[in-house]
Amino acid sequence: MDIAIQHPWFKRALGPFYPSRLFDQFFGEGLFEYDLLPFLSSTISPYYRQSLFRTVLDSGISEVRSDRDKFVIFLDVKHFSPEDLTVKVLEDFVEIHGKHNERQDDHGYISREFHRRYRLPSNVDQSALSCSLSADGMLTFSGPKIPSGVDAGHSERAIPVSREEKPSSAPSS
């Protein structure tokens, strides 16, 4: 078995072109050394590698599931309360907007805002859509699918966000 050994100077040749955490969903949670200078760490210490597991944990969760019977969106919004969230259905899209004003945390003052837009499948029953926020900050937007050939009814409407007292059963991958 041959193992190719790559010289450390070439390890991050495309470093500036790799995406960083700066534009991830939870960019407001703080920056790490590798976020600001991702290629510098490998230049100074060629054997230093950031933890891939840490990067996965830092990126948050946004998952869409569409099976035969229902359509579900899981979105990690742990920094927002139901009052900070707006969920609207506009024709074939669901728009989720979260915004909270400046508040104090461990590192000073911070304000956060995000806007997500997802396309709804054409066979989702828009009159039966629901949205809930679990105790651990997982927003679950769901709607049943209807048999093909039946009109799903497209209109603009707001979906209220209800609060659940139990943690989410969404995957934590």
Curated annotation (Swiss-Prot):
Zn(2+) 2 binds at H107. Glycans are attached at S162. The keyword Membrane does not apply. Pfam families: Crystallin, HSP20. The keyword Acetylation applies. Residues 153-167 have a biased composition (Basic and acidic residues). The modification N-acetylmethionine is found at M1. It comes from the Eukaryota. Heteromer composed of three CRYAA and one CRYAB subunits. Inter-subunit bridging via zinc ions enhances stability, which is crucial as there is no protein turn over in the lens. Can also form homodimers and homotetramers (dimers of dimers) which serve as the building blocks of homooligomers. Within homooligomers, the zinc-binding motif is created from residues of 3 different molecules. His-100 and Glu-102 from one molecule are ligands of the zinc ion, and His-107 and His-154 residues from additional molecules complete the site with tetrahedral coordination geometry. This is Alpha-crystallin A chain. The gene is CRYAA.
